[in-house]
Amino acid sequence: MAASELLKSRVENLRDYELVVILTTDTPKEKVEAILEGISKTIAEKDGSFTEVNHWGKRKLAYLIGRYGEGYYVFIKMKAKPSSIRKINADLRISEQVIRHMAINMDEE
């Protein structure tokens, strides 16, 4: 197998990711669910899925982020392709309700 074929096959494989999203505390529950549904649809388009979703709830931030001292935390474990993660990051970056987010690839050693 050529190196380029190997790289392409590795890039397109599903990988395990953990995603933490911190939302503003005044975000309505319906909007939280809409954001999670949007993430789910994005990864489902490329055969991915959530394996676990935990609402950690309202917590104090370690430091102020903008004007926010508290945030509503959501922790997600999922199987997704890297291209899905790039789209999720772009979507979350422009959302007004998202204070901060981070996706981590759990497959890397």
Swiss-Prot record:
Keyword field contains rRNA-binding: yes
Gene3D superfamilies in UniProt: 3.30.70.60
SUPFAM superfamilies for this protein: Ribosomal protein S6 (SSF54995)
Key word Nuclease present: no
Entry keyword set: Ribonucleoprotein, Ribosomal protein, RNA-binding, rRNA-binding
Gene Ontology biological process terms, A to Z: translation
GO molecular function, one term: small ribosomal subunit rRNA binding
GO cellular component: cytoplasm; ribonucleoprotein complex; ribosome
Record Pfam families: Ribosomal_S6
InterPro entries, alphabetized: Ribosomal_bS6, Ribosomal_bS6_sf, Ribosomal_S6_plastid/chlpt, Transl_elong_EF1B/ribsomal_bS6
Cited CDD domains: bS6
Signal peptide (from-to): none
Family matches, as HAMAP family: Ribosomal_bS6
Function: Binds together with bS18 to 16S ribosomal RNA.
Family: Belongs to the bacterial ribosomal protein bS6 family.
Protein name as annotated: Small ribosomal subunit protein bS6
Organism: Dehalococcoides mccartyi (strain ATCC BAA-2266 / KCTC 15142 / 195) (Dehalococcoides ethenogenes (strain 195))
Gene name as annotated: rpsF
